[in-house]
C-alpha cells in the first residue's frame, strides 16, 4: 500500500483575484504551472507507480514496477527514470487515473470536502461482449448465443469475420484485427481494474467495503463519496436500490447505518423518469452526514 501526504498548494493561489478576464487567465496560468510541478513531484510519481503496477500487462520482458522500486521512490534511493516508472505512468495516463489527495490537497488537508454530490454510472466493471461490440461490430453483438459470439471474435482476431459471413476468401481485413486488439486491450484493462478494486483493506485496498464480487461502478462511487467528505460534511448520490439490498454492498450499507452516517434514503421506481431504464427498475437518493 502507499500512504500519501497531502501536498500544499502555494497559499497565494487562493488569494489571487479573478474579477476580470485577465485575472482569470493569470490564475489559470499559475494553476497550470502548479499542475506541472505536481506531475514531477515524487508523490505523484509514486502514486502512478503503485496504480500502474495493476494496469500493466504481466508479460515476459515487460517493465513492471516492483515493491522495492516503490519503496525506493518513497525513500529517495530509486531513480524516477527507471523504465518501469515510465511504463506505469503511461498506463495511468491511458486509463485516466485520478489521485484525489494530490489533485485537491487543500480540501484533503481539512479532512475532505464539505459537500460531495454524485450521479455515478450504473454498470459493471466486467467487460460485457455484447455491449462492447454493439456499436463497434453489430454482427458480433447480434450473435444468437455465447458460442457463436466467441467464434466470431476468433474470426475477428484472424481478420476473417467478414469473409466468413459473406462466404468469400481473401486477405485478412486490417480493420478487424485492429478492432480485436482494441477489444483485447479493453478486456485486459477491465481485468486489471477488477483486481485493483478487490485488493483487501489489510493490503491497502481502495474500496474495502464495495470491492466485492461482481463489482458495479455505482457501489465504488458510493464508497468514494463517503471517503471524500470531511467528518462534518455531507454526501448525496443517486444509485440503484441494490446499494441497500444486495449481498455485495451489505458491508458498505451496514457501515453507514451503524456509523450513523445515513441521513436519508428515498427509494423510487423509475416510472419512466429515465426512458433508457426499465420502468420497474428501482433507485435511491441517499444522503450521508
Provide a role label for each language-model segment.
Residues 1-100, 243:
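Nucleic-acid modification enzymes, centered on SAM-dependent nucleic-acid methyltransferases
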Residues 1, 93-289:
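Signature of N6-adenine DNA methyltransferases within the class I
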Amino acid at each position: 500500500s502507499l500512504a500519501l501526504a497531502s501536498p500544499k498548494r502555494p497559499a497565494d493561489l487562493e488569494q489571487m483575484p479573478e474579477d476580470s478576464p485577465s485575472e482569470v487567465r493569470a490564475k489559470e496560468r499559475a494553476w497550470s504551472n502548479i499542475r506541472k510541478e505536481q506531475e514531477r513531484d515524487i508523490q505523484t510519481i509514486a502514486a502512478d507507480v503503485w496504480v500502474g503496477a495493476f494496469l500493466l500487462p504481466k508479460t515476459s520482458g515487460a517493465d513492471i514496477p516492483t515493491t522495492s522500486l516503490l519503496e525506493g521512490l518513497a525513500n529517495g534511493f530509486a531513480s524516477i527514470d527507471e523504465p518501469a516508472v515510465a511504463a506505469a505512468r503511461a498506463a495511468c495516463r491511458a486509463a485516466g487515473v485520478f489521485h484525489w489527495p494530490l489533485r485537491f490537497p487543500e480540501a484533503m488537508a481539512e479532512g475532505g470536502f464539505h459537500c460531495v454530490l454524485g450521479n455515478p454510472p450504473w454498470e459493471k466493471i466486467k467487460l460485457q461482449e455484447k455491449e462492447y461490440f454493439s456499436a463497434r461490430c453489430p454482427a458480433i453483438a447480434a450473435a444468437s448465443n455465447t458460442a457463436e459470439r466467441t467464434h466470431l471474435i476468433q474470426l475477428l482476431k484472424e481478420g476473417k469475420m467478414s469473409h466468413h459471413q459473406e462466404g468469400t476468401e481473401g486477405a485478412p481485413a486490417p480493420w478487424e484485427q485492429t478492432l480485436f486488439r482494441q477489444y483485447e486491450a479493453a478486456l485486459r484493462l477491465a481485468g486489471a481494474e477488477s483486481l485493483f478494486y478487490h485488493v483487501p483493506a489489510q493490503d491497502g485496498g481502495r474500496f474495502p467495503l464495495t470491492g466485492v464480487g461482481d463489482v458495479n461502478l455505482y457501489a465504488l462511487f458510493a464508497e468514494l463519496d463517503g471517503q471524500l467528505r470531511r467528518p462534518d460534511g455531507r454526501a448525496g448520490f443517486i444509485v440503484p436500490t441494490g446499494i441497500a439490498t444486495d449481498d455485495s454492498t451489505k458491508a458498505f450499507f451496514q457501515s453507514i447505518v451503524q456509523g450513523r452516517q445515513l441521513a436519508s434514503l428515498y427509494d423510487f421506481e423509475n416510472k419512466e423518469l429515465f426512458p433508457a431504464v426499465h420502468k420497474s427498475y428501482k433507485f435511491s437518493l441517499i444522503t450521508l452526514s
